[in-house]
Amino acid sequence: MAKTLGLHIIADLYGVNPDLIDREEDIRHLLENSVKAGELTKISSHFYQFNPHGATGVILLAESHISIHTWPEHKTATVDVFTCGDPSKAYRAMDYIINSLSPTHVDKKVFDRGIIEDSKGKDVLWIMSKAGCC
Amino acid sequence: MAKTLGLHIIADLYGVNPDLIDREEDIRHLLENSVKAGELTKISSHFYQFNPHGATGVILLAESHISIHTWPEHKTATVDVFTCGDPSKAYRAMDYIINSLSPTHVDKKVFDRGIIEDSKGKDVLWIMSKAGCC
């Protein structure tokens, strides 16, 4: 039986008010709050202001990552939420971002990432070797 | 006529030698070199070591981002390369990572991100307002 290691939601947001996505501090605030909305665990966050327009940012999570890249001159933002563990957390984080930016149109896709055969289990020999067992 | 703002390659790598993806310093080296292979422009890079196994990391690019999350106990790594501009750079960066990790199987998908109607052009009024023109 297969199981998946992660859930990845990608969303392209169109018709966004450009003033909401132009500044690094605004997308930082947006993504930090999405982490709270999803009850996710932040490791670190990193943002960058482009000149003259747009910003980019990522939050590394214990559960994987959230990223955003913005083109305010096109009223467009691309957002990724990739989490392992409880899938509802990814949906809650993405919903927070979409609701906050109120795009006129969203192109959203959802993928399972890392599909493994549960029957094969873990690489026990390697794990034991790392633990100094063999 | 439509044009796309970015190209996103996602790849799940299976059957990877776990010793190649267990340590933060190894995936840092891998991703930093993929940036060079793709002739991409690094803004900043961020990595984290999980305990007991696996690591996570992202490089913010002027062109968007590269990320990796690893599960050495499952011989699995998930990799994203998302770039705007010349699409060949994304392929070269991803090819570098895949060739370096030599997985037995790869599940790879490619997406256009941010598809805009070129005929609509940019939001000129907003751009002018930001430039203090109106």
Curated annotation (Swiss-Prot), chains A, B:
InterPro entries (alphabetical) = AdoMetDC_fam_prok, S-AdoMet_deCO2ase_core, S-AdoMet_deCOase_pro-enz
The protein's annotated pathway: Amine and polyamine biosynthesis; S-adenosylmethioninamine biosynthesis; S-adenosylmethioninamine from S-adenosyl-L-methionine: step 1/1
Q: What Enzyme Commission number(s) does the record list for this chain?
A: 4.1.1.50
Biological process annotations from GO: spermidine biosynthetic process
Top-rank lineage group of the source organism: Bacteria
Q: Does the keyword S-adenosyl-L-methionine apply?
A: yes
Family recorded in the similarity comment: Belongs to the prokaryotic AdoMetDC family. Type 1 subfamily.
Keyword tags: Autocatalytic cleavage, Decarboxylase, Lyase, Polyamine biosynthesis, Pyruvate, S-adenosyl-L-methionine, Schiff base, Spermidine biosynthesis, Zymogen
Instruction: Give the note describing cofactor binding and stoichiometry.
Output: Binds 1 pyruvoyl group covalently per subunit.
Q: Which cofactor does it need?
A: pyruvate
The entry's cellular-component GO terms read: cytosol
**Residue numbers carrying Pyruvic acid (Ser):** S64
| Annotated active site | S64, H69, C84
Q: What is this protein called?
A: S-adenosylmethionine decarboxylase proenzyme
Please give the function described in this protein's UniProt entry: Catalyzes the decarboxylation of S-adenosylmethionine to S-adenosylmethioninamine (dcAdoMet), the propylamine donor required for the synthesis of the polyamines spermine and spermidine from the diamine putrescine.
* Molecular function (Gene Ontology), one example: adenosylmethionine decarboxylase activity
Q: Does the keyword S-adenosyl-L-methionine apply?
A: yes
Q: How is it modified after translation?
A: Is synthesized initially as an inactive proenzyme. Formation of the active enzyme involves a self-maturation process in which the active site pyruvoyl group is generated from an internal serine residue via an autocatalytic post-translational modification. Two non-identical subunits are generated from the proenzyme in this reaction, and the pyruvate is formed at the N-terminus of the alpha chain, which is derived from the carboxyl end of the proenzyme.
Catalytic activity reads: S-adenosyl-L-methionine + H(+) = S-adenosyl 3-(methylsulfanyl)propylamine + CO2
